[in-house]
From Swiss-Prot:
NCBIfam families: rbfA (TIGR00082). Disulfide bonds: none annotated. The keyword Cytoplasm applies. It comes from Thiobacillus denitrificans (strain ATCC 25259 / T1). Keywords: Cytoplasm, Ribosome biogenesis. The gene is rbfA. The keyword Nucleotidyltransferase does not apply. This is Ribosome-binding factor A. GO terms for molecular function: ribosomal small subunit binding. It is found in: Cytoplasm.
Length: 124
């Protein structure tokens, strides 16, 4: 591995690969439906992992999914310990990722600006 690719990043990448499969196969909580893990950040000493996720639906669905994930975090951590070759698996903290919503809002603003610009003839 290159020197500029730290171990914490590799652990985060592995958690990002393993976690969706574990959630899909092992978590039986109906609040945790279809979700996407967008990013995992592991701190330098690999004690904590912040897991960013997105789901479809409204604010109530996001909150319910977050509650389900928080409730299952200990179980998911223990399942990760069986799959990963680590002495200590990081404690998982789940955070709803609003970047997709922000991106869609920006796209709508750009489309609106382009449509408004198209209505006005260009000055030449």
């Amino acid at each position: 591995m290159p020197k500029d690719f730290p171990r914490a990043r590799r652990v985060a990448d592995q958690i990002q690969r393993e976690l969706p499969e574990l959630i899909r196969q092992e978590v039986k909580d109906p609040r945790v439906g279809m979700l996407t893990i967008t990013e995992v950040e592991v701190n330098r000493d690999m004690e904590f992992a912040k897991v960013y996720f997105t789901t479809m639906g409204g604010e109530a669905e996001h909150a319910a999914c977050l509650q389900g994930l928080q409730r299952a975090s200990g179980f998911l951590r223990s399942q990760l310990s069986h799959r990963m070759q680590l002495r200590v698996v990081p404690k998982l903290t789940f955070v709803y990722d609003r970047s997709v919503e922000h991106g869609m809002a920006l796209s709508r603003l750009i489309e609106t600006a382009v449509a408004e610009d198209a209505k006005h003839p260009k000055d030449e």
